[in-house]
Swiss-Prot record:
TM region positions: 33-51
SUPFAM superfamilies named in the record: F1F0 ATP synthase subunit B, membrane domain
Membrane topology (UniProt): Single-pass membrane protein
Protein name, UniProt field: ATP synthase subunit b
Subunit structure: F-type ATPases have 2 components, F(1) - the catalytic core - and F(0) - the membrane proton channel. F(1) has five subunits: alpha(3), beta(3), gamma(1), delta(1), epsilon(1). F(0) has four main subunits: a(1), b(1), b'(1) and c(10-14). The alpha and beta chains form an alternating ring which encloses part of the gamma chain. F(1) is attached to F(0) by a central stalk formed by the gamma and epsilon chains, while a peripheral stalk is formed by the delta, b and b' chains.
Cellular component GO terms, alphabetical: plasma membrane-derived thylakoid membrane; proton-transporting ATP synthase complex
GO MF term (any one): proton-transporting ATP synthase activity, rotational mechanism
Function of the molecule: F(1)F(0) ATP synthase produces ATP from ADP in the presence of a proton or sodium gradient. F-type ATPases consist of two structural domains, F(1) containing the extramembraneous catalytic core and F(0) containing the membrane proton channel, linked together by a central stalk and a peripheral stalk. During catalysis, ATP synthesis in the catalytic domain of F(1) is coupled via a rotary mechanism of the central stalk subunits to proton translocation. Component of the F(0) channel, it forms part of the peripheral stalk, linking F(1) to F(0).
The entry's keywords: ATP synthesis, CF(0), Hydrogen ion transport, Ion transport, Membrane, Thylakoid, Transmembrane, Transmembrane helix, Transport
Family listed: Belongs to the ATPase B chain family.
Subcellular localization(s) per the UniProt record: Cellular thylakoid membrane
Amino acid sequence: MPAWLLAVAEPVTEATEGSAEKGILDAILESNLINIAIILSLLYILGRRVVGEALAKRREGILEELRQAEQRKQEAIERLAEEQQKLAQAQQEAERIRKQAEANAEARRQELLQQAEREIERLRANAERDLSAEQEQILQELRRQIVRQALSKVEQELPQHLNEQVHQRLIERGIQMIAR
């Protein structure tokens, strides 16, 4: 029997020795104390094993949860690293696409500028050609009008001042001027 149980039971037995009535009660009390001591001892012995096993299981469960949490943490760190790598690659790809788009835009801008310059040059050449043709046409029309007016005036004044031979030469000159 454990020492603490004997220490509790001893004062109770000393106090009950003086009376006979108390003898029965003391015996019951003593037997109850012994029974309680036995039950407590059994509970301690058996309970220690059960509680120890329960605590060991609980500790194993906690350790397993910690291992799983650590594993999930490592997996999360690995996934994070992978996602960061993917993000970096996506950013590099986006930068490459942006630079390519800028280069394409610049090339297209240069192409459009060159095309516009060629179109301006073509329009300028057409305008100069049209202007030259129009100027030539106007000059020819002016020459014709001048020749007509001159001939008309000469025809009015010439018969009075010239003879037939001079008249014929003037007509030929007028025809030559018109032919130019």
